Regions:
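Beta-strand-rich, repetitive solenoid scaffolds
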Residues: 231-232
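Beta-strand/loop edge motif enriched in small/polar residues
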Residues: 1-227, 238-249, 253-254, 267-270
């Protein structure tokens, strides 16, 4: 699917009836296999609004170039390369669940403005075990179709979220010297292995606020065939969220209130 410049794609499901975007193979086995279709390609100057949608099983999920995207209450999983591939785009996502993407669940290139609140960005996979499988990859650079490098300022805010995987590191930042690279990780659970791999110092950075590293979220089931990224009793995500941040997204992806003792991630524990 291709959305041309100046066009708007509205995907409006409900809690009871999510809009499903997948390949044309109807057998359930293909719901857990990537590379069945290409992507939703958003041209420069296009707009996306997505609410209560399930997007899975292709090469890239949302392939956006200078796109303005608003994503709420949605699932993006099982893609050969990226769930979200964004070049110089503006993305606002609340109650987003991601998993099982080869290169990275979210790939941010040539900067942009990105806000992820109460997101569960996991990346676990047997099938794609040889890939990088980052949770978030962000850089100021992007190589265009002519193989020329373009640069862009980046603002990235991840709040009350989980970014975790079975890899040693789930967040990778590559800043270009002299380019704006502002990020905030607030009240999050992050898989982190060190400055050289992640591109930032979790322990000393003032951009890391009340977040924890390497605390297993205790997902119910992170494998694609029976994926359930709610957290179990005893999860460090329970009560981890900022109440002030939770007030901006007061119900979770299943319409459960989170205004009290908010759980980081897309699901409120109850």
């Amino acid at each position: 699917m291709k959305v041309l410049s100046g066009s708007t794609l509205n995907i409006n499901g409900t809690l009871a009836n999510n809009v499903i975007l997948r390949g044309d193979r109807n057998d359930l086995a293909h719901d857990t296999i990537p590379k069945n279709w290409n992507s939703i390609k958003m041209d420069a100057g296009s707009t996306l609004t997505m609410n209560y949608a399930r997007l899975f099983g292709g090469m890239r999920g949302l392939e956006m170039k200078q796109t303005n995207a608003t994503i709420n209450n949605s699932f993006i999983h099982t893609f050969q390369e990226y769930g979200i591939y964004a070049v110089g785009s503006t993305v606002t996502a609340n109650n987003l669940v991601m998993n099982n993407c080869g290169e990275s669940a979210i790939g941010i290139f040539r900067g942009g403005t990105h806000n992820y609140t109460h997101a569960t960005i996991a990346n676990y996979s047997d099938l794609l075990h040889s890939y990088n499988r980052n949770g978030i990859f962000a850089t100021n650079e992007w190589k265009n179709e002519s193989n020329q490098t373009e640069q862009g300022a980046l603002i990235l805010n991840v709040r009350n979220s989980i970014v975790y995987s079975d890899r040693e590191n789930s967040v990778v930042f590559e800043q270009t010297p002299g380019q704006l690279f502002n990020f905030t990780l607030q009240n999050c659970l992050i898989k982190y292995s060190g400055t050289s791999e992640a591109g930032f110092n979790f322990d000393t950075s003032t951009s890391v606020i009340q977040s924890d590293k390497n605390q297993d979220p205790l997902f119910v089931n992170y494998f694609a065939a029976q994926m359930n990224l709610r957290v179990k009793q005893g999860s460090p995500a329970i009560g981890k969220g900022s109440t002030a941040v939770a007030a901006t997204v007061p119900t979770d992806i299943a319409n459960v209130s989170r205004t009290s003792n908010p759980t980081s991630g897309a699901y409120q524990y109850f």
